[in-house]
Amino acid sequence: MKGSENMANLTNHERPGIYSGYEMASVLQSGSGGKAVAIAALVSGADAGLAGEVVTLHKADGFSSESVMGQMVALALANGAYCVYAYGVKDAGAYAAAYEALLGCDNVGVLVSDASGESGLQLVRDAVVAASNDRRECVGVCGVRGAVSEQIALAQAVNSERMVLVGTTAAGEGLFAAAVGGAVAALGDVSVPLGGAELNGALPECGVFSDNEIDALVRSGVTAVESRRGVVEVVRAVTSRSKSGNGSDST
């Protein structure tokens, strides 16, 4: 009986553990060859001339290697995307047009955006939901950072099995989103969870979350990413769907 009591008193943490029914790998119906990644991000300077059009890339040579868009493209490819469709936007008002153009491209399974804030993330969500309802199955991937409570609030505002919010402690949200998006697109077997996956490419070093913070993030629909011994890895990969109606939803 004492052994049973000890087992009952164990704390169940989300690092790692039993995966929820809304694992992001289970939403994207990818084939054995993977999916293409579509990226929308602000561009300026030398890349401004490419704004407002879809650029198809199989290697990271279309945009400046120092720009956010250039780095996002490189990271998506480095993590397994076989093809990237990139659409540079000049201002916040151009994102809707970017999503419409990108989601009309061939074999897109992941839409990555550097959008931020509640309204920006919800715009991505609405775009991928509309595409999926039109039989163009895809998920959106965006980055979030800041206090754990702020990341949770954004996930709850999005609350969709079609959206993955990549939470870190470091700046460069779009970069982390692109890396995770590439890894998701590369999955040939949708039953394989992405938790614990190492991310390739030049990513900013980010901090480590406590077990309690991981619990709070994952249970609220945030995919936690952190650095350990110089390696950036996905702790748990979930979609932002955490509530159904007014109650929690982990099915």
What are these regions (language model features)?
Residues 66-104:
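A broadly used, surface-exposed interaction patch
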Residues 8-15, 19-30, 34-51, 55-58, ...:
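A glycine- and small-residue-enriched flexible loop/hinge signal that marks low-structured segments
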